[in-house]
Amino acid sequence: MRTRVKICGLTREQDIASAVQAGADAIGFVFYPASKRHVDPARAAQLRREVPAFVDVVALFVNPRPDEVQAVLDHVAPDLLQFHGDETPQDCGRYGRRYLRAFRAGAPGLDSAAGLAAACRQYADAAGWLFDSYSAGYGGSGQGFDHGLLAGVQADPASCAIVLAGGLHPGNVADAVRAVRPWAVDVSSGVEDAPGIKSAGKIRQLMAAIKSVDQVAR
């Protein structure tokens, strides 16, 4: 199985080009104002024009108002929504769009394999469950987490993908993919020179590391 790759937190046209040329399957835009990688709908609409067909655009939100999500739907037309805050299943599903639900592994209630698995089951209609590490704030932490917490998570890739995030970079992504065998990985700070500024070289290194694992697994 080929591991899919999402590069998140893009803010520049040249970084979209680098990700696409390296073989990324999805591009993520962050619509969380507190993030250093935040873009507004107008800017995201400009960037979206650089994304070719067959590369998905994912819109990341943290506890958004419905009108904020609607503005992104209207201006950007993302392929997937991603919810990274305290959104309920009803919050995530109200837009009638495919969505990813992010879980901060290690957070209170999500600090055991059983607790994390139970939380996932509440979002059975999600297109994917994304697992990130816990930090006091919202959004990606850039830190890893104990992948043993995923032991109780069961998902059918045909209906709900497992997406691994949390401190992934070219130096550790191969081991992470080998251990978890996720449908996809989601990487942001691990391929950056600065927040929101991606490194074409690091993106290529990341893709090569993932490909090396996938080839052995065939």
Curated annotation (Swiss-Prot):
Keywords: Amino-acid biosynthesis, Aromatic amino acid biosynthesis, Isomerase, Tryptophan biosynthesis
The keyword Amino-acid biosynthesis is assigned to this record: yes
InterPro entries tied to this protein: Aldolase_TIM (IPR013785), PRAI_dom (IPR001240), RibuloseP-bd_barrel (IPR011060), TrpF_fam (IPR044643)
Biochemical pathway: Amino-acid biosynthesis; L-tryptophan biosynthesis; L-tryptophan from chorismate: step 3/5
UniProt superkingdom: Bacteria
GO molecular function annotations of the record: phosphoribosylanthranilate isomerase activity
GO biological process: L-tryptophan biosynthetic process
The keyword Transport is assigned to this record: no
CDD domains per the UniProt record, alphabetical: PRAI
Catalytic activity: N-(5-phospho-beta-D-ribosyl)anthranilate = 1-(2-carboxyphenylamino)-1-deoxy-D-ribulose 5-phosphate
One Pfam family it belongs to: PRAI
EC number: 5.3.1.24
Family as reported in the entry's similarity comment: Belongs to the TrpF family.
Cross-referenced PANTHER family: N-(5'-PHOSPHORIBOSYL)ANTHRANILATE ISOMERASE
Protein name: N-(5'-phosphoribosyl)anthranilate isomerase
Organism whose genome encodes this protein: Bordetella pertussis (strain Tohama I / ATCC BAA-589 / NCTC 13251)
